[in-house]
């Protein structure tokens, strides 16, 4: 398993332990990708997982740029069109600065 897949697996376990149900992983469409898709009660949660091994370029949080947010929104729109409904939704981030389940930061509404 590569580091990205390991980070996504850690994030999925972390979110599940906080009550979210993972309903999709690595959803891809032309122009975008969503790492994890989850449900928290009736809210669809699109999760970007970011892993950084050091803070040389600002850490995991700084790596979510405006361009990355646009790609997430594009992929989410595609996903919603595919499922044919518009539930309440939000965009979260799971930030890991190492492959350490004790050091995961969950940011809602990025």
Question: How would you name each of these model-derived features?
Answer:
Residues 1-25:
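Acidic-basic catalytic patches of nuclease active cores, encompassing PD-(D/E)XK
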Residues 30-32, 100:
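Short acidic/glycine-enriched loop/turn segments that link adjacent beta-strands
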Residues 34-60, 64, 72:
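Conserved catalytic cores of phosphodiester-cleaving nucleases, focusing on short active-site segments
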Residues 82-110:
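Domain-level recognition of nuclease-like catalytic cores that cleave nucleotide substrates
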Residues 26, 50, 92-94:
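Solvent-exposed beta-strand sheet faces enriched in polar/charged residues
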Residues 67:
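Aromatic- and charge-enriched substrate-recognition/interaction segments
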Residues 21, 44, 88:
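Hydrophobic "anchor" residues on beta-strands that sit immediately upstream
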């Amino acid at each position: 398993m590569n580091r990205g897949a390991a980070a996504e697996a850690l994030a999925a376990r972390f979110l599940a332990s906080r009550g979210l149900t993972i309903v999709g992983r690595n959803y891809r469409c032309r122009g975008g990708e969503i790492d994890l898709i989850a449900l928290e009660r009736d809210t669809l949660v699109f999760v970007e997982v970011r892993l950084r091994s050091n803070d040389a370029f600002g850490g995991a949080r700084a790596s979510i740029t405006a361009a990355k947010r646009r790609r997430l929104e594009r992929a989410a729109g595609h996903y919603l069109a595919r499922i044919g409904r518009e539930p309440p939704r939000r965009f979260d981030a799971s930030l890991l600065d190492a492959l350490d389940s004790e050091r995961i930061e969950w940011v809602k509404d990025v």
